[in-house]
Amino acid sequence: LHMIHLHWYQYPPMNPMMYPLLLIFMFITGIPCLAGNFVTIWVFMTTKSLRSPANLLVVNLAMSDFLMMFTMFPPMMITCYYHTWTLGPTFCQVYAFLGNLFGCTSIWTMVFITFDRYNVIVKGVAGEPLSNKKAALWILSAWVLSFSWCSAPFFGWNRYVPEGNLTGCGTDYLSEDALSRSYLYVYSVWVYFLPLLITIYCYVFIIKAVAAHEKGMRDQAKKMGIKSLRNEEAQKTSAECRLAKIAMTTVALWFIAWTPYLLINWVGMFARSYLSPVYTIWGYVFAKANAVYNPIVYAIS
C-alpha cells in the first residue's frame, strides 16, 4: 500500500466486469504471442538458409517479445483473477523492470533492423554488408543499454510502483520530484522519440530509393519495348524492398502500441486530474499486444 500514490485513492474500485475482459484479452494475446514468437525463433534457428546476419536481428526481436509475454502473461492473469496486485512489492518492481527491459530491447532491435534495410537499399553496393559480428554487436548493445536504463529506478532515479488499476506495475509518473521526472524525460527520449526520429530518417530515404528504382525499371522497360525488366539483380532488389515494407509495418505497429503508455506517463506528470485507473489499462493493453504483431508480420513475409 505504501507504493500506491494518493491520487488513486479518490477513485472507486473499477467495474468488476473489467477484470474478466482483461483476462480474456490476455489469454487471446498471450497464447498466440508465445506460440508465434517461439515458432519464429525455432524456424530461423533450424533453417540453415535463414541464418543470415539480418535474421539474427529478427530472432532477437522474437526473443524479446517472447520473454515479455512469458514474464507478463502469468502475473497479469493472477492479478486480474484477484482484482488487485497480490504478488508483493518486490515482484511489482521486478515485473515493471522486465516489461520495460523487453519493450526497450524490442524497439531498439527494430531500429537496427530498419537501419540494416537503409544500408542495403539506400547505400546498396557502397554500403558495408551486415556481418554476424556486427549484428551480434547491435544485439548486445540493445540489451546492455536497455538493461542500464531500466535498472536506474532500483538506484533512486524514479521508481517502479503499482498502476492505478492495481493489476500491473510501471514507472512512477505521478511523483512531482524533479529527479524522478527527469528520468521520464530522458527515458521518453531514449525509448520513444530518438528511435522515432531515426526510423523516420531511414524510411524517408528508403522510400525515395525504392521509388527511384521502380521508376528506373519502368523507364528502361519502356525503352526496350517490354512490359517489365526483372533480371536476377532486380528480383533481389525487389525482395529487399518487400523486407523494408515488412520492417516499416512492424515499427509502425510498435509505435502505435507504445504511444498510449507514453501519453499516460505525460498526462500523469502534467494533467493527472484527467487520469483515472481505467485509462491506465489501455497503456499496457496496447503495449502487450505489440508482442503479438511481430511474428504475424514476419510469418507473412
Curated annotation (Swiss-Prot):
Q: Per the record's keyword annotation, is Membrane included, yes or no?
A: yes
What disulfide bonds does the UniProt entry report for this chain? C92-C169
Give yes or no: UniProt keyword Ribonucleoprotein.
no
Chain ranges on the Cytoplasmic side, renumbered to this chain? 44-55, 116-134, 205-245
Q: Which InterPro entries match?
A: GPCR_opsins, GPCR_Rhodpsn, GPCR_Rhodpsn_7TM, Opsin, Opsin_lateye, Retinal_BS
How does this chain sit within the bilayer? Multi-pass membrane protein
**Do you know which Gene3D superfamilies this protein is assigned to?**
Rhodopsin 7-helix transmembrane proteins
A Gene Ontology biological process in which this protein takes part is: visual perception
Sites where a glycan is attached: N165
GO molecular function terms attached to this record: G protein-coupled receptor activity; photoreceptor activity
Q: Which residues lie on this side of the membrane: Extracellular?
A: 1-18, 79-92, 156-182, 268-278
Motif 'Ionic lock' involved in activated form stabilization covers 116-118
**Post-translational modification comment from the UniProt entry:** Contains one covalently linked retinal chromophore.
Task: Give the keywords, sorted.
Answer: Cell membrane, Cell projection, Chromophore, Disulfide bond, G-protein coupled receptor, Glycoprotein, Membrane, Phosphoprotein, Photoreceptor protein, Receptor, Retinal protein, Sensory transduction, Transducer, Transmembrane, Transmembrane helix, Vision
Q: Which residues carry this modification: N6-(retinylidene)lysine?
A: K288
One cellular component (GO) term of this entry: plasma membrane
User: What subcellular locations does the record give?
Assistant: Cell projection, Rhabdomere membrane
Which family does the similarity line name?
Answer: Belongs to the G-protein coupled receptor 1 family. Opsin subfamily.
UniProt-recorded name of the protein: Rhodopsin
Q: Which gene encodes it?
A: RHO
